[in-house]
Amino acid sequence: MAEMKTDAATLAQEAGNFERISGDLKTQIDQVESTAGSLQGQWRGAAGTAAQAAVVRFQEAANKQKQELDEISTNIRQAGVQYSRADEEQQQALSSQMGF
């Protein structure tokens, strides 16, 4: 397995990328819901029922994906905080041992 190197700033940047993607997805969800809402009065019969069901499936899947992206972002941010804390503790321990 390849070695992974990172730092707190990189983790924060990547968390921001996931937040941006989540925000973009939310924009798409809102656009689909708006379009579906404006067309809903025109949906009739089996085709209308199928269209409504498709919108519901889309909403469920997209909302689940957004939730996953938000959780990933949170986890990355927490990892960055933990990384910084551990780095600081190691720096203090080393400084203490060396008498700095």
Swiss-Prot record:
GO terms for biological process: protein secretion by the type VII secretion system. Disulfide bonds: none annotated. The modification N-acetylalanine is found at residue 2. GO terms for cellular component: extracellular region; host cell endoplasmic reticulum; host cell surface; peptidoglycan-based cell wall; plasma membrane. The keyword Coiled coil applies. The keyword Chaperone applies. It holds the Pfam family WXG100. It is found in: Secreted; Secreted, Cell wall; Host cell surface; Host endoplasmic reticulum. Changing residue 98 to A: Abolishes interaction with EccCb1, but not with EsxA. No change in stability, but loss of secretion. Able to form a homodimer. Forms a tight 1:1 complex with EsxA (ESAT-6). The complex persists even after secretion. In vitro EsxB only interacts with non-acetylated EsxA; it interacts with C-terminally truncated EsxA (missing the last 10 residues). The native EsxA-EsxB complex dissociates at pH 4.0, and EsxA may then be freed to then lyse membranes. Another study using recombinant protein did not find dissociation at acidic pH. Recombinant heterodimer (with a His tag on EsxB) can be dissociated by the detergents amidosulfobetaine-14 and lauryldimethylamine N-oxide. Interacts with EccCb1. Belongs to the WXG100 family. CFP-10 subfamily. A secreted protein. Acts as a strong host (human) T-cell antigen. Involved in translocation of bacteria from the host (human) phagolysosome to the host cytoplasm. Might serve as a chaperone to prevent uncontrolled membrane lysis by its partner EsxA; native protein binds poorly to artificial liposomes in the absence or presence of EsxA. EsxA and EsxA-EsxB are cytotoxic to pneumocytes. EsxB (and EsxA-EsxB but not EsxA alone) activates human neutrophils; EsxB transiently induces host (human) intracellular Ca(2+) mobility in a dose-dependent manner, monocytes and lymphocytes do not respond. This is ESAT-6-like protein EsxB. It comes from Mycobacterium tuberculosis (strain ATCC 25618 / H37Rv).
